[in-house]
Amino acid sequence: MAKVAIVMGSDSDFDKLKGCVTKLKEFDIEVDVNVISAHRTPDEAAEFAKTAEEKGIEVIIAAAGMAAHLGGVLAAHTIVPVIGVPIKSTFDGMDSLLATVQMPPGIPVATVGVDNGTNAAILAAQMLSLKYDYLKQALKASKDKIAEGVRQKNQKIKELVKEL
């Protein structure tokens, strides 16, 4: 079974990551959730990253707000792929987004949109689908469901237009 760690900088970030946890579980991916701060517990952050691979963690999703250095700190200490989720706080999340996405060469953090843990989960599943065939089918089914929802909305709009 695939395994993903979600690391958040503060417990206050958890509400914005519930969709991430739910989506990973929908894909039957084992989830390991942690609160580790890049600034308040830097030694724990480094140790977590250094030992992630031996714990079977295959992707790390790092979520943080404000000076969102968590993803970068974790990425600096591991070869496990890190996906950053900037969390909206001050400056409408722009500070978190820039801190997460603007990494120096050699220390990549794949970054999704502000507060978009669900996309982080989907991206993690896509990465893992290269190793786990069951995820390929789950991802295809998920995209088919999204497409069907759009088709239904399209039909509804067409019917509303006829009524005008």
Give the residues covered by each predicted segment.
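Glycine/charged-rich beta-loop-alpha catalytic/anionic-binding loops adjacent to active sites
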Residues: 2, 29-32, 55, 79-80, ...
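Glycine-rich phosphate/diphosphate-binding loop of Rossmann-like nucleotide-binding domains
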Residues: 2-40
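Short glycine/serine/threonine-rich phosphate/pyrophosphate-binding segments
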Residues: 13-17, 41-45, 64-73, 92-94, ...
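N-terminal beta-loop-helix "entrance" segment that forms/cooperates
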Residues: 36-54
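Glycine-rich phosphate-binding loop
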Residues: 48-86
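Short, glycine-/small-residue-rich phosphate/pyrophosphate-handling segment
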Residues: 91-137
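Glycine-rich phosphate/pyrophosphate-binding loop and the adjoining helix
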Residues: 129-164
